[in-house]
Curated annotation (Swiss-Prot):
The cytochrome bc1 complex contains 11 subunits: 3 respiratory subunits (MT-CYB, CYC1 and UQCRFS1), 2 core proteins (UQCRC1 and UQCRC2) and 6 low-molecular weight proteins (UQCRH/QCR6, UQCRB/QCR7, UQCRQ/QCR8, UQCR10/QCR9, UQCR11/QCR10 and a cleavage product of UQCRFS1). This cytochrome bc1 complex then forms a dimer. This is Cytochrome b. Binds 2 heme b groups non-covalently. One of its GO terms (cellular component) is mitochondrial inner membrane. Its cofactor is heme b. Pfam families: Cytochrom_B_C, Cytochrome_B. It is a multi-pass membrane protein. The keyword Coiled coil does not apply. It comes from the Eukaryota. Heme b b566 binds at H97, H196. A ubiquinone binds at H201. GO terms for molecular function: metal ion binding; ubiquinol-cytochrome-c reductase activity. Heme b b562 binds at H83, H182.
Amino acid sequence: MANIRKTHPLAKIINNSFIDLPTPPNISAWWNFGSLLGICLILQILTGLFLAMHYTSDTTTAFSSVTHICRDVNYGWIIRYMHANGASMFFICLYMHMGRGLYYGSYTFTETWNVGIILLFTIMATAFMGYVLPWGQMSFWGATVITNLLSAVPYVGNDLVQWIWGGFSVDKATLTRFFALHFILPFVALALAAVHLLFLHETGSNNPSGIPSDSDKIPFHPYYTIKDILGALLLILTLMLLVLFSPDLLGDPDNYIPANPLSTPPHIKPEWYFLFAYAILRSIPNKLGGVLALILSILILAIIPLLHTSSQRGMMFRPISQCLFWLLVADLLTLTWIGGQPVEHPYIIIGQLASILYFMILLVLMPITSIIENHILKW
């Protein structure tokens, strides 16, 4: 009798994706983040589902319902904090995963890379709308400021903003639609993740050397399943340490004040994982220019495959490019810091310089460096 794992229509798909999948023998821990992202997504959907059972998307009761979850629902506090900090873990894994793709040239799998960018936008939209739901001060004002950016769109801007708000300000209609979209988008992300994997398994995984490994592959199970389980345990350990010891470490204290349209917080800022983009937005003293820079800071990833000028795939054997990559990481950390600071000297100029450097590294310095390295190799 044939092995059911290899013959059953459904089991066959799982087998070819997670068990008998031919995998390069030399992929490092940087390749763990894909599976960790899958775990994060499932964890967020499960905790979110239980939160949605008790949450009410009405401006008068939203804040109270979150308080009720934390105080009265059995283990509601841990579900709420796992969901909030799970989002932070999600973005940490996401940025690591993208960094790995940039460093090792995984963007040359253009279909996989482009689906990944769409996934990133989906998850960013989901996280933004989730931040609005507790209906605290930062929720309300964050929603007001970020949705208001759409008014910079020529001709239709104001109509677009009012259409998204469902009125003339962020109110009950906005909260209700944000809850509906926040609930549905993770399932869209789940479907996109399946497409992401589908495209990846068409080409097979990249590896640190960037050299094709078709002649030397090992099965995914047991070698990488055990490695992924170790990664998952470390992820859950980190998450639970965060949840149980300092659940509000990454949150904003202002969100414990109920939303008040008559009182503006001294410093409106999004969650920490959006601060780099927020800093780029603020670094341009023009509304439309800032919005364009904000969108381009993410969309720039789509043209990375076109800017690949190196004769080698990854950066493993390209020390000058490695220096530039880590400069980019440092620049993004600087932007994240600036995004959380008030708009005053010297933060304004630091933010502007860091924003210029971000685009310079990706659009100019990296392609030129790759060409120089190609010539050095021929000496």
